[in-house]
Amino acid sequence: MWRLKVGAESVGEEDEKWVKSVSNHLGRQVWEFCADAAADTPHQLLQIQNARNHFHHNRFHRKQSSDLFLAIQYEKEIAKGAKGGAVKVKEGEEVGKEAVKSTLERALGFYSAVQTRDGNWASDLGGPLFLLPGLVIALHVTGVLNSVLSKHHRVEMCRYLYNHQNEDGGWGLHIEGTSTMFGSALNYVALRLLGEDADGGDGGAMTKARAWILERGGATAITSWGKLWLSVLGVYEWSGNNPLPPEFWLLPYSLPFHPGRMWCHCRMVYLPMSYLYGKRFVGPITPKVLSLRQELYTIPYHEIDWNKSRNTCAKEDLYYPHPKMQDILWGSIYHVYEPLFTRWPGKRLREKALQAAMKHIHYEDENSRYICLGPVNKVLNMLCCWVEDPYSDAFKLHLQRVHDYLWVAEDGMRMQGYNGSQLWDTAFSIQAIVATKLVDSYAPTLRKAHDFVKDSQIQEDCPGDPNVWFRHIHKGAWPLSTRDHGWLISDCTAEGLKASLMLSKLPSTMVGEPLEKNRLCDAVNVLLSLQNDNGGFASYELTRSYPWLELINPAETFGDIVIDYPYVECTAATMEALTLFKKLHPGHRTKEIDTAIGKAANFLEKMQRADGSWYGCWGVCFTYAGWFGIKGLVAAGRTYNSCLAIRKACEFLLSKELPGGGWGESYLSCQNKVYTNLEGNKPHLVNTAWVLMALIEAGQGERDPAPLHRAARLLMNSQLENGDFVQQEIMGVFNKNCMITYAAYRNIFPIWALGEYCHRVLTE
């Protein structure tokens, strides 16, 4: 049976040397297979098999797992926290305050039971389907696939890939997406490397997958990221890639297209890609690689026109088509520049550029304890370290962090989009629990969560000259996941600060000692340093270049990736945090804070669309951004009566209410930038909770509470008997077009919204 190990228990004595930490591994989460049959009860084993069977049977209709393995592991704790049967409110029946409190008590009973001993909440952060294949290819090429991934890991990975294969035989960019060449070719290759036969899988799954690929022209039509991975494996030629010259890292920073000016995820992915491209690295040409060369293409491998293939992309993948200017640019570099730097004397500059790239790779690895910014650059950096020296400590240190990214549930094992969302979920959870006013009953839960937030704050800046490594100040910030990860994010810092400030208002005998004021001030300092001239806040750093740089975005699959844009969500979260800080600590940098909030409010108003909506870049989508937009403006002192933007936002959200109450927004809203209901006009608990809180914040209860009552009824009626809430469609997004699961949202936001509803809308 699989068991989740968290924190220090996730590191064995023999691994301690190779798993670096600045926080005693706080928040680390690793799934391990327990081979001790005596540790598993027949009841648990039956539950696991039933969960797997149920997911597989419904896989084409319900793409999200419900993290049932985690619930089975915490079964005893959940039973202890049980508070009786769920309350159901009939249509037309008045929602009573006691009924809401009863629902909240059951919800918190369940949610407290699944809190880890470290104080955070572990949950699935999967969804993208292009991550696992990159890991499998890298481990295969370096010859460590079967030593890093046990037989049980490989079985679960195959289960996951088969479970998320679409009915047409292909795979999407993410688990709810339609089939793409990027997803289909890479996942087909991953299954072959994991040991599946070319005609294996139930119901001819591999045959169907191959047919999907070949019917659309074969793997030459894969996206640029896919071309790189296939080149590394040896089933695609480097001459079929558009150039990724590492010499970009030698250019002066004053140039607007210097990599240091790009969004950190963009530069950190293209950094190792440029190293591999500059090296033209290819793994061992094995019989399986030779077989894949035959399986993936419609013509013999040696007859493929690789130059033509550079700009070939399947129509199913083409979210961001290359502008003509970009094709001319890459063509010029390909035909003129690259030949000069692959032979003497230009090769000397290429070697210098490769050395510079590796210095940046090693800096990123060491500064993140080999977790790295995200899963893509994690695997690419690991591969680069092996290419540089297969026996290096750097490569060994990387291998020990692979499992930080793996998550298993009833649908199988995936690679997550980060090493978790531990801090993010915990900061939200604290605010949700505080909103219920059931603090007395759940003080131990809050105390553990409080400790986690305090210990997760980044307490030092990155070493060395930040200008050399293109880093922002970090001291006082919070990450999305763990302190060991080490990368600040603006809205994570804001939510961490808000949670800390809220708990500072409660008795320390209940929730622990508050965070020291100097550390609160450090967080404020980081937030103030992140505001752009237009008043908005980007995600990780200041916006360092111009939107026109998107013209050279080479990733056909993703939008708006080249620079770090200011976001509605990051801006609004920061406004809330600064407002609360000013209220509790009025003497610290008050004038600067007031100025920052005023500029941010103006930014939010400018970002609002004509119909009253805001486009959400990190959640689905208009409901998510609407919640943040309204909260941010209210934090700035605006009201429904005084602010046209708030009135328009409320009108927009109310216009999207479903006939039976609630809201249900599809991920297609993100992709197409047009509000789109879920298929069948189904309501979604998380969208409904976001809108319920947004409308409460804007004073809807004083004008017409009927939509609020309908939303609350929907949330209450969706609670399961054990206090959990049902897992529905995907709610996270990045880069406009790729979705990501935040499994804890199904608990956090219904609890938070019902808490706000209970105490701000209902009367005694």
Curated annotation (Swiss-Prot):
Its EC number is 5.4.99.33. Keywords: Isomerase, Repeat. PFTB repeats lie at residues 104-146, 154-195, 520-565, 597-637, 646-687. GO terms for cellular component: lipid droplet. The active site is at residue 491. Changing residue 488 to P: No change of product-specificity. No change of product-specificity. CDD domains: SQCY_1. GO terms for biological process: triterpenoid biosynthetic process. One of its GO terms (molecular function) is cucurbitadienol synthase activity. SUPFAM superfamilies: Terpenoid cyclases/Protein prenyltransferases (SSF48239). It catalyses: (S)-2,3-epoxysqualene = cucurbitadienol. It comes from the Eukaryota. PANTHER family: TERPENE CYCLASE/MUTASE FAMILY MEMBER, TERPENE CYCLASE_MUTASE FAMILY MEMBER. Belongs to the terpene cyclase/mutase family. Oxidosqualene cyclase involved in the biosynthesis of the highly oxygenated tetracyclic triterpenes cucurbitacins. Converts oxidosqualene to cucurbitadienol and does not produce lanosterol. This is Cucurbitadienol synthase. It comes from Cucurbita pepo.
